Curated annotation (Swiss-Prot):
Cited PROSITE patterns: COPROGEN_OXIDASE
Pfam family, one: Coprogen_oxidas
Important for dimerization, annotated site positions: 177
Gene name per UniProt: hemF
The EC number(s) this enzyme carries: 1.3.3.3
UniProtKB keywords: Chlorophyll biosynthesis, Cytoplasm, Heme biosynthesis, Metal-binding, Oxidoreductase, Porphyrin biosynthesis
Name assigned to this protein: Oxygen-dependent coproporphyrinogen-III oxidase
Class of the enzyme per the UniProt entry, highest EC level: oxidoreductase
Active-site feature positions: 113
Residue numbers binding a divalent metal cation: 103, 113, 147, 177
Amino acid sequence: MSLSQPSTQSRVKVKSFLTGLQDDICKGLENIDGEGTFQEESWERPEGGGGRSRVMREGRIFEQGGVNFSEVHGEELPPSILNQRPEAKGHKWFATGTSMVLHPRNPYIPTVHLNYRYFEAGPVWWFGGGADLTPYYPYLKDTRHFHKIHQEACDSINPKLHKVFKPWCDEYFFLKHRNESRGVGGIFFDYQDGSGKLYKGQNPNGLSSIASKELGEYKLSWEDLFSLAKACGNAFLPSYIPIIEKRHNQTFSDRERNFQLYRRGRYVEFNLVWDRGTIFGLQTNGRTESILMSLPPLARWEYGFKAPPESRESLLTDVFTKPQEWFTDESLEEKCRPHHAVD
């Protein structure tokens, strides 16, 4: 397919995958929860398009979770897009995506986020997406498992991709005002149109940019990138379900619950201040309830809180909210072992 002439069939193929991904994820999550079910609400956008939002509340595992599909189009692009891709100015646009955020009740099960999307505006098109994990009481083995499954998905297309997408995730899901990562990362990519360098982010001196420069000019076809989105999207359930199976019966006290709610506050801060998807949705008159379904049902803030030294909570704030080389840094096991947080 020519970079300058994406066909209408492209939209059909992507929509079929994204709606199927929503179906598969919802089915898998309902199976593991055992009690909660997703309630669907279809919606239409007055300016063009619509979607279907699915939310689970008060399940056995999930306190709240949402899996949304949207397909929207319009005449004029919002500033959040034009700032990144000014060549799209003046073109009608089309955007579709499936996004998900899950907030488990048990503090030992991480919050998780996924989003895969496709965009067209005249001759301009791109894929974006990724998945990231946000633990509260982290385990090194869980973190490594999540990363391993997503690395294998990237490697199935090309083994060089993960070297760019892993640090890009660390870079994107970073709370600049807190100087900490939102979680332990995963993968992230955006503005992938098959041309130029893989990294198209905003930090020319970051690790992702450096890795991308080392690869040089990198050509990927539309089908390559579509296959990447499919491989990564289908990697989600195998990356997350085993963590639930291992942690959902762990007991917890008010201390763990309060710390979970406190750390959920960081999730709220990122999504409302930094997340480009939230900003794009609000700037294009998207469905507010669907856009903000990523927020947890409960969260708390505490002025000046610091985790006690050498505590289980400090393991999160001192180690797991900083970008790490999860497989090659041997010191991580030494840091986790005193807290019984390796396995």
